[in-house]
C-alpha cells in the first residue's frame, strides 16, 4: 500500500459516527411525508467478509489475468484506441462534454456539472493505464479542469452549484483522485468523500431508519434517493479506502437491502407481492420505482398492473449488478442470502448483448457495472442456470470489441441517459475493459441458494 493510501485511509475512513435517532429533528422540506413508506429497518449485520481490494492499474502482462492471452492483447489495443479517441476530443480547458448539460432522472433542468463528472471518469480511465498528471499532459489538463470547477484554494468544495448532480460529480472525482494516488490531491479527495457522507439521507435530515429514504443518495434538488446514485457513492468510498465498517456504508446497506426483490429480507409490499427473484430495482423510496416495470408496460411505480394483482416491481440488469457489487463492497459474505440471491439472478439473466429488462437502454452503463461487479466477486468463471460455464472476461471483451467503431469510439443507438453521446459511452466502455484486465485475485465462489 502506498504512503498516499495509508494517509487517505487515516483521513477519510473514519467518517462522522451514526447520529442518534431523534424523532424531534424536522423532516427535510424536500421530502413529501405523504409518499414515504415505513417498515421496521432490516437487520444489517456487522462486516462478515473482507471487501475486495482496490486495484488501481490494469495488468502489465496477460499472465496476470485469467482470460485468453488473445483477449488480453485485444483489450489493451481496444483501450488504447478508445483513449486516443478521447484524447482527440478533450476540450482546450481539459474537460469532456463541456457545455453539454445533463439532467438526472426526473430533473427538470440540465446541469453543466455533468461535464465535471465525465471528465473525472475519463481521468480515471487514463490513470488506470498509467497515464497520470505527472507524466501525461492529457491527465494533467483533466485534473486542472476538475480543480478549477469544484473549489480551488480558499473555496469550499461544491460539486454542482446548480444542485442536481452533486452526488455523481463528487463520486466521480473521489474515484478519479484515488486512482491517481497523488498526495497533492488529498485535500480535494477528502472534501469529496466528506461531501458524499454529509449528503447521504439519514437522521440529520430527520430520516429515521424506518423510512424508505434512509441510507440512500440521490439528486440534490428532487432529493429522492436511488440505487444508481447510491452505488456511485459506494464505488467512490470503496475506491478512496473508506472502511466497510464506516457508518455511511452501514447506512447504505439498509438502503441496498430495501432495493432488492427479496421478501425474506425486504418487508416492502412490492417485494412481498412480486417475483422475489433476488434482483434489484431503481429505488425503494416513496414506495418504490423500477424502469424495468415501465419498460414492461406496468408503469414505473407498478401502477398499471392489472386490478386484482398484487403490486410488484421488476428487477433489471444494471441495478442488479450495482446492488450485487455494492453488497460486496459493504463487506457482506458470499454466503449471505442477499448476495446469493443476487448472484442467482445474474446466473438466470446472463448476457452482454443488452441490459436485461431494459434492452439497449443504459447498455454501456450496464457493462461498466457488470465489469466492476464481477471483478469484485473475484470469480473467473460464471456458470449460468443452464449449466454453461462463461469466462466473463473473454466474453465481455469480445462483446465490447464487436461494438467499437473504427475511430475507437463506442455509442449506443438508444440515447436515453445520454448514451447517444460517443464520449460518455467510450468512457464507460474503456473503464469496463480496464476492469476486465486488472490483475485478479483468487476467492471462494459465490454459491446460489439452490447449490448444494
What feature does the model see in each segment?
Residues 1-21:
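Sec-dependent N-terminal signal peptides
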Amino acid at each position: 500500500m502506498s504512503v498516499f493510501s495509508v494517509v487517505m485511509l487515516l483521513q477519510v475512513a473514519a467518517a462522522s459516527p451514526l447520529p442518534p435517532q431523534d424523532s424531534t429533528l424536522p423532516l427535510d422540506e424536500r421530502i413529501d411525508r405523504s409518499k414515504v413508506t415505513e417498515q421496521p429497518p432490516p437487520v444489517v449485520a456487522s462486516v462478515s467478509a473482507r471487501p475486495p481490494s482496490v486495484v488501481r492499474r490494469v495488468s502489465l502482462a496477460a499472465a496476470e489475468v485469467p482470460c485468453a492471452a488473445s483477449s488480453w492483447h485485444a483489450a489493451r489495443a481496444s483501450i488504447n484506441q478508445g483513449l486516443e479517441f478521447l484524447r482527440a476530443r478533450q476540450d482546450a480547458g481539459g474537460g469532456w462534454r463541456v457545455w453539454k448539460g445533463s439532467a438526472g432522472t426526473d430533473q427538470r433542468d440540465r446541469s453543466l456539472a455533468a461535464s465535471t463528472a465525465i471528465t473525472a471518469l475519463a481521468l480515471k480511465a487514463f490513470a488506470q493505464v498509467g497515464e497520470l498528471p505527472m507524466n501525461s499532459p492529457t491527465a494533467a489538463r483533466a485534473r486542472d479542469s476538475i480543480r478549477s470547477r469544484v473549489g480551488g484554494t480558499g473555496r469550499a468544495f461544491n460539486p454542482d452549484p446548480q444542485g442536481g448532480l452533486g452526488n455523481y460529480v463528487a463520486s466521480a472525482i473521489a474515484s478519479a483522485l484515488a486512482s491517481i494516488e497523488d498526495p497533492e490531491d488529498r485535500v480535494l479527495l477528502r472534501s469529496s468523500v466528506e461531501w458524499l457522507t454529509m449528503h447521504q439521507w439519514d437522521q440529520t435530515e430527520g430520516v429515521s431508519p424506518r423510512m424508505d429514504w434512509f441510507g440512500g443518495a440521490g439528486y440534490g434538488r428532487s432529493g429522492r434517493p436511488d440505487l444508481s446514485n447510491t452505488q456511485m457513492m459506494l464505488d467512490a468510498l470503496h475506491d478512496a479506502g473508506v472502511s466497510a465498517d464506516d457508518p455511511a456504508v452501514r447506512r447504505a446497506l439498509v438502503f441496498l437491502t430495501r432495493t432488492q426483490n427479496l421478501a425474506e429480507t425486504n418487508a416492502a409490499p412490492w417485494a412481498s407481492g412480486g417475483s422475489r427473484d433476488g434482483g434489484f430495482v431503481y429505488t425503494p423510496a416513496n414506495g418504490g420505482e423500477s424502469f424495468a416495470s415501465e419498460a414492461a408496460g406496468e408503469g414505473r411505480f407498478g401502477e398499471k398492473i392489472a386490478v386484482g394483482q398484487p403490486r410488484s416491481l421488476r428487477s433489471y440488469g444494471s441495478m442488479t449488478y450495482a446492488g450485487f457489487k455494492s453488497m460486496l463492497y459493504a463487506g457482506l459474505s458470499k454466503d449471505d442470502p442477499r448476495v446469493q440471491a443476487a448472484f442467482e439472478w445474474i446466473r438466470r439473466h446472463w448476457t452482454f448483448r443488452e441490459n436485461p429488462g431494459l434492452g439497449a437502454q443504459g447498455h454501456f452503463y450496464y457493462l461498466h457495472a457488470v465489469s466492476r461487479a464481477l471483478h469484485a466477486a473475484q470469480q473467473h468463471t460464471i456458470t449460468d442456470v443452464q449449466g454453461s460455464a462463461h469466462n466473463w472476461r473473454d466474453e465481455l471483451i469480445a462483446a465490447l470489441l464487436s461494438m467499437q467503431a473504427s475511430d475507437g469510439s463506442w455509442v449506443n443507438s438508444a440515447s436515453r441517459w445520454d448514451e447517444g453521446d460517443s464520449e460518455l459511452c467510450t468512457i464507460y466502455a474503456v473503464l469496463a475493459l480496464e476492469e476486465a484486465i486488472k490483475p485478479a485475485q483468487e476467492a471462494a465462489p459465490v454459491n446460489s441458494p439452490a447449490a448444494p
